[in-house]
Amino acid sequence: MLINVVLIILLVGLNGKASGQNQGLCSPDENASCADSSDTQDEFSFNILRKIKKALASYQPCSSDANDANCSCHAAVIKSDLAPYKATGVSRQMIESSARYGTRYKIYEKRLYREENCMFPARCQGIEHFLLPLVATLPDMDLVINTRDYPQINMAWGNGAQGPILSFSKTKDHRDIMYPAWTFWAGGPATKLHPRGIGRWDLMREKLEKRAAAIPWSQKRELGFFRGSRTSDERDSLILLSRRNPELVEAQYTKNQGWKSPKDTLDAPPAGEVSFEDHCKYKYLFNFRGVAASFRLKHLFLCQSLVFHVGDEWQEFFYDQLKPWVHYVPLKNYPSQQEYEELLTFFRKNDALAQEIAQRGRDFIWQHLRMKDIKCYWRRLLKSYVKLLTYEVQPEDQLIHIQPAKDEL
């Protein structure tokens, strides 16, 4: 395997350098400082290769069935998210106390109902697209679905929300139950390129697959690439590295709705947006959290580029089976410019390894994040969730009947 060959070469090189030092190339007084940058990079490279090898050795694919018709890759997430309610069940009082933290939905007698006021209509539309085809197969149930960006049940807040509340993203500090975000069908951040949100994951998959095929690995630009707004200063060091070393990184800030002056783009004019398809021109793509998990991550993988994912606290339902060093390159929160430089330099020198990781990341998303996987996840989630209800669901006059939109009939 390629990783073993590279490790052996590095070991031989490191041992040779150690032997040379023992023969007097560095005096005892100089040992702490005489190693040059190539020595440092070799040691760094060895550590990275060791991490990759360890990750691959322990990695078990989530399904032996490439078709994975039962979306078994994501089943553990459902079990984990519902576990806090297994002992107590879900009572009517729990639903009522949680209602103000999300949008009330009800499935009753094979029909879907919702409270009339939806804070984000496009987001509700994206959710309802997946719920409507399922209602004929599901028992009666009440749901509280959060359409805000931020999860609602932080165990440290003590805000009275005991759940259950469904949210698209969370951290380990939250008890929200994750569901596939509305953006798989509608909504998402409104940008100049996508004024109504990215939407239609099925269509974007096909676009990115065609674009990636048109720009094979050997034709991609050997640069780190990022384009996005400054929703967090965690992204600043990559932008500053790009200004200092544009031969290594091409990263710039774009405008968002809160932009007022160049200070909001780190004292530079805002850059133009870049389509996901044009991200595929670059070998190394960076993903950062936003207010919560970033909607861009799943798109980046389909470029068949190497994804660098910064931070691991924010999750969506499919993140659990994406493994660091197997499918992507992990970085801790707030990486320094030096950390970016070292990793990019390493993967430039180990191009075949970079391509292998990129391919595994692409294959996982392509095989296990299809539209049928999204539908399957919703079905499995709701069938497991309804078993927790401890009361008989009743009709409510104040809820409105949701029917399929005309363009979905």
UniProtKB/Swiss-Prot annotation:
What would be one Gene Ontology cellular-component term for the protein? endoplasmic reticulum lumen
Database matches in PROSITE patterns: ER_TARGET (PS00014)
- Site Interaction with the consensus sequence C-X-S-X-[PA]-C in peptide substrates — annotated at 120, 230, 257
Which pathway, per its entry? Protein modification; protein glycosylation
Q: Which InterPro entries match?
A: CAP10, O-Glucosyltr/Glycosyltrsf_90
Citing just one GO molecular function, the answer is: UDP-xylosyltransferase activity
> Where is the major localization of this protein?
endoplasmic reticulum
Q: Where is the signal peptide?
A: 1-20
Q: Where in the cell is it found?
A: Endoplasmic reticulum lumen
Which EC numbers characterise this protein's activity in its record?
2.4.1.-
- Motif Prevents secretion from ER, per the record, lies over 406-409
Positions of the UniProt region annotated as Interaction with the consensus sequence C-X-S-X-[PA]-C in peptide substrates:
190-195
Task: Name the residues annotated as catalytic in the UniProt entry.
Answer: 149 (proton donor/acceptor)
UniProt-listed GO biological process terms: negative regulation of Notch signaling pathway; Notch signaling pathway; positive regulation of Notch signaling pathway; protein O-linked glycosylation via serine
Q: Name one Pfam family in it.
A: Glyco_transf_90
Report the SS bond pairs.
62-73, 71-376, 118-124, 280-303
Where does the chain bind UDP-alpha-D-glucose? 227-231, 235, 274-276, 292-296
- UniProt key word Endoplasmic reticulum: yes
Top EC category? transferase
Q: Which key words tag this protein in UniProt?
A: Disulfide bond, Endoplasmic reticulum, Glycosyltransferase, Notch signaling pathway, Signal, Transferase
Top-level taxon in the UniProt lineage: Eukaryota
Biological role: Protein O-glucosyltransferase. Catalyzes the reaction that attaches glucose through an O-glycosidic linkage to a conserved serine residue found in the consensus sequence C-X-S-X-[PA]-C in epidermal growth factor-like repeats. Regulates Notch signaling by glucosylating Notch in the ER, glucosylation is required for the correct folding and cleavage of Notch.
Which family is this protein grouped under?
A: Belongs to the glycosyltransferase 90 family.
The protein depicted here goes by the name O-glucosyltransferase rumi
Recorded source organism is: Drosophila pseudoobscura pseudoobscura
